[in-house]
Amino acid sequence: MYIAGVMSGTSLDGIDVALVRIEGSGVDSKVKLIHFTTVPFCNDIKSEIQQALSIENSNVQLICSLNFKLGLCFANAVKEVCKEANFSLEQLDLIGSHGQTIYHQPKPEGNMIASTLQIGEPAVIAYDTNTTVISNFRTMDMAAGGQGAPLVPYSEVILYRDPSKNRLLQNIGGIGNVTVIPSQKSDQNVIAFDTGPGNMIIDEVCQRLFQLPYDQNGEIAEQGEVVDEILTYCMNHPFLKMNPPKSTGREQFGEEFVSQLLKRYEKYSKENILTTVTMFTASSIVYHYKEFILPYYEIAEVILGGGGSYNDTLVEMIRYGLKDEKCTIFIQEDIGYSSEAKEAIAFAILANETYHRNPSNVPSATGAKKSVVLGNVTYPSI
């Protein structure tokens, strides 16, 4: 089957689309990436998403309209990846669309029950591409008592499980998440959870203090020094002390967190602030390994992916934090994969599993009571 996986993440840097060929289903699936592209959001759409994400500035009319606008954006992104690959849209069998997360409430709080909302209307995508769309992957896991995240572990087992080595996969998107993949000969469980901020705080600080979308290759962070006072403040965030499985998002590490941090520590240079929040991402990742993984799993390889793996300063900070551990650190490209395409490929794989009616959540990662088939199916017009 030919499937387009569509991902718009918490970094808001655009729409990632992976055109993938998948043979079979389940753990024996054979997956080949045909083409990958990122379609940037226009400024107006990005501004509307940012407004929709804000509790103070959002409104139901905006979210209603944006749901359909993003459906068109996702449909156009699928057309673009097919065009770039010289692949006929009529040959496409499925689209797996994650959607744009507007709010994620992984656990009950006050009178709010556990819930999640991703938008990007699948009916619009299906109609505009004349292709079956599978979307809304997180909700069934939450209905089964899970946190709806992380969802990529299932695809990571298919793609990365090694016959003899335990591997640890770290995604560094807007949020960081880790998956422990035991070797094929191991009887240990796959576990996965969010490690805290990935690029989210780094990008927000970069935009506010340097008027740049992100710190390219970590060049600015390389120039500054870590401020221990700020790092201690960040590392005391209650999310870090929670036991897995756990998930987080912009609600905890987004604009409000950055606003409070910058107000509290405005006396420090902007370079030192950026260096310190970069170290916070690295330190939160290393902390979770040492606290929740390395005492229980003998890890041979750590594989870094996502946009953060291109931040050389961040990667070196992670390497330094793990210098005394017996594991080798790679980025996706070192082993023949793409850091950028990883999550989009994951949602193509999840769409394939849903099409075959196979459960594809990992209860040991999400906390769900049982394995369930994920996603809603939207058929095109006849």
UniProtKB/Swiss-Prot annotation:
Alphabetized UniProt keyword annotations: ATP-binding, Carbohydrate metabolism, Kinase, Nucleotide-binding, Transferase
UniProt name for this protein: Anhydro-N-acetylmuramic acid kinase
GO molecular function: ATP binding; kinase activity; phosphotransferase activity, alcohol group as acceptor
EC number of the protein: 2.7.1.170
Similarity comment: family membership: Belongs to the anhydro-N-acetylmuramic acid kinase family.
The keyword Membrane appears for this protein: no
General function of this protein: Catalyzes the specific phosphorylation of 1,6-anhydro-N-acetylmuramic acid (anhMurNAc) with the simultaneous cleavage of the 1,6-anhydro ring, generating MurNAc-6-P. Is required for the utilization of anhMurNAc either imported from the medium or derived from its own cell wall murein, and thus plays a role in cell wall recycling.
Keyword Magnesium in annotation: no
Enzyme class: transferase
Reaction catalysed by this enzyme: 1,6-anhydro-N-acetyl-beta-muramate + ATP + H2O = N-acetyl-D-muramate 6-phosphate + ADP + H(+)
GO terms of biological process kind: 1,6-anhydro-N-acetyl-beta-muramic acid catabolic process; amino sugar metabolic process; peptidoglycan turnover
Positions with a binding annotation for ATP: 9-16
UniProt pathway: Amino-sugar metabolism; 1,6-anhydro-N-acetylmuramate degradation; Cell wall biogenesis; peptidoglycan recycling
Organism superkingdom: Bacteria
